[in-house]
Each structure stands twice: as C-alpha cells, then as structure tokens.
Design a protein with these regions (language model features):
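Short, surface-exposed coil-to-beta transition loops
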Residues: 2-4, 65-71, 97-103
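A short, structured loop/turn motif at beta-sheet edges
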Residues: 10-14, 74-81, 105-115
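Hydrophobic ligand-binding cavity/cleft-lining segments
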Residues: 1-49
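A non-catalytic, amphipathic alpha-helix used as a structural packing/dimerization or gating element
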Residues: 139-147
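Glycine-rich portal/gate segments that line the openings of hydrophobic small-molecule binding cavities
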Residues: 38-92
Length: 155
C-alpha cells in the first residue's frame, strides 16, 4: 500500500531540502491528526542527522497511541535528483506491525519553486489492517500537502 504527493511548493529547493531535515516540520505537517514526540532524553534534535536513528512515538490526535518507531535518514541522488529516505522502523503498537519506506525527492523548477515528490509505501501485519488504515493515511497525506503549501513560503 502507499500514499503519495506530487506538489509544487512556493519555496526555493534548498529551503525545502533544509526544512525536510527539521523535526519541527515533521511535527507541524501531521498534527493534529498524528502528533509525534521524541523518546530521546533531550527531545528532538535540531536537525535529522543521516545515519543516526532518533526514537519517536506518535499518537492519533495526541491521545490514541500509535506506537514507537525511529527516524533514520539517508540522503542520496537518483539521476541527479536529491532524495531523502527514512529507513526507520516500528518498534511497538501499530508502528510495530508496519514495514515502511518513506521517500521525499525535491526538484528545482527554476523559478524559485520546488516540486516535492513524497511517497510512503507500507505493509501491515496482518495485511487487512493496512487496508483498514489506508483511508486515514490518505487523509493525513492530504493534510501534509496543505500544511506544506502553507508553510513553504516561510522556509
């Protein structure tokens, strides 16, 4: 199963790439539907560091636990296009039943705007759980699109 976005953001590509490495942006584009919190003693880092796993937890609407997972960023290029991939995995709760791959690619449109390709591919155990969760995932991804469009000019 997957959810994805292909949206144009009103921000330069370097600003978008920088914002995607910010835990505060991850939090801002998913709440109130999914509220993330750091499990690290010192809270969220200022930036995600490639190769360094950061423990997090999430709750639907801030009250219904979704479980623990971790963010583990990789940066690479595909045919000259920068890609950010989260290799993190679930530890408990719903996240513990999920195998996922989250990739975001940014393309400079040459006019000060950026094309963002954002795709989450996931598999749940049992598979029917993935089907049941898909409508909610789709709603969260549409919310992400709205919030990213709203926030991008401030990046």
């Amino acid at each position: 199963m997957h959810v994805g976005l292909r949206i144009v953001l009103d921000a330069p590509v370097d600003a978008v790439r920088d914002a995607l490495l910010s835990p505060s942006v991850m939090v801002a584009v998913t709440k109130p539907f999914l509220v993330y919190r750091s499990r690290a003693a010192g809270g969220f880092p200022e930036r995600w560091t490639p190769g360094r796993a950061e423990p997090i937890t999430a709750a639907a609407f801030g009250v219904v636990p979704s479980g623990d997972t971790h963010v583990d960023i990789d940066l690479y290029e595909v045919q000259g296009v920068p890609v950010q991939r989260d290799n993190g995995g679930g530890v408990s709760g719903l996240f513990g039943r999920m195998d996922m791959s989250h990739r975001m690619a940014t393309v400079d449109l040459g006019d000060g705007r950026t094309l963002l390709l954002d795709r989450l591919t996931y598999r749940m155990r049992p598979a029917l759980l993935g089907l049941a969760l898909w409508p909610g995932m789709w709603v969260i991804w549409q919310w992400r699109a709205l919030r990213m469009r709203q926030l991008a000019p401030t990046w």
